[in-house]
Amino acid sequence: MRVIKRNLRGDEGEISLVAESLDDLWHLKHLVSPGDLVFATTQRKISGATDKLRPEKAERRTVRLGISVEAVEFHTYSNWLRIHGVIKSGVDIGSYHTLNIEAGSELSIIKRWRPDELQRIEEAVAESNRPRVVLALVEEGEATIGVLRQFGVQTVAEIRGGSGKGSGSSVRDDFLKEVADQIANSAGDDAYVVLAGPGFTKEDLRKVMEARYPDLLKRLTMDDASSTGRSGFQEVLRRGTVDRIVEASRISRETRLMDDLMKEIATDGRAAYGIREVREAANYGAIETLMIVDQLVRRGDVESLIRDVAAGRGRVVIFSTEFEPGERLEALGGVAALLRFRIPGAS
């Protein structure tokens, strides 16, 4: 994400952004809220005064519109962010329109900004300068390949093949070649690759990659995992391999924060969870790190909590419920905190 203009008075005003990736569209989903004013270049059918009786003559033109947002829709598989609302600036004022935002789109958002939203923008800008990471998990006859996004690991391929046991070694060779090709395709010219899995299959796959894609080896890191699939992705993230490659990825950070939280809860330590307990900790000025699932940040009591914690120099981390750490936090009520000191009745 790139910030191209920032014009704020206090916490209100305009920020103009360029969405550079699918991750940025996901961030924008959480930055744009109903009631915000959003400007972007878009396509719209424009009818002249003489064309009103013949709507088929309406011409689709490129125009810049400002809309008052009513709904925001984003699906990771679509590569589009759809912002729907009423036109407030430009042609056909008062009519409804949907802005389709994709990677490369520029838009301006005018609103009252929460501290966590401004922090999210800073994180998105920082993340855009970090390398991409592909996670490849392989065991006999089975492989799962995912791309690490800021909202979680996006599975891009699941491959099944022969193990070579009873079906001939050529079947196994074909399987390994197919997996190697998919990894190379996903990695492109710049992504780092973490290759993991149980047993020695990953070592055999590495040899195939060395023969077929020797230039990729300098970007490849080997690791262990007990299985393929989602649980395997989570295991690799917990081991810290991704952190060593990308410094501190969002998902690895969320996983570690949740692990720290659960340790503190288990030992009756410096932790609070649930809105009532966390609000009490905020009143004491005890919150070091506030952890909230993304689905709750626009709720009134949570929004005021975020502002109070930010004012007290606490850190605010918004968790995605699309991945396992966010699901764990959601099970605790969606709100928790690591504390500077214990407070009466916490945990």
Curated annotation (Swiss-Prot):
GO terms for biological process: nonfunctional rRNA decay; nuclear-transcribed mRNA catabolic process, no-go decay; nuclear-transcribed mRNA catabolic process, non-stop decay; ribosome disassembly; RNA surveillance. The keyword Nuclease applies. Keywords: Cytoplasm, Endonuclease, Hydrolase, Metal-binding, Nuclease. The keyword Hydrolase applies. Pfam families: eRF1_1 (PF03463), eRF1_2 (PF03464), eRF1_3 (PF03465). SUPFAM superfamilies: Dom34/Pelota N-terminal domain-like, L30e-like, Translational machinery components. GO terms for cellular component: cytoplasm. It is found in: Cytoplasm. Its cofactor is a divalent metal cation. Its main location: cytoplasm. One of its GO terms (molecular function) is endonuclease activity. Transmembrane segments: none annotated. Its EC number is 3.1.-.-. HAMAP family: PelO. May function in recognizing stalled ribosomes, interact with stem-loop structures in stalled mRNA molecules, and effect endonucleolytic cleavage of the mRNA. May play a role in the release non-functional ribosomes and degradation of damaged mRNAs. Has endoribonuclease activity. The N-terminal domain has the RNA-binding Sm fold. It harbors the endoribonuclease activity. Belongs to the eukaryotic release factor 1 family. Pelota subfamily. This is Protein pelota homolog. It comes from Methanothrix thermoacetophila (strain DSM 6194 / JCM 14653 / NBRC 101360 / PT) (Methanosaeta thermophila). The gene is pelA.
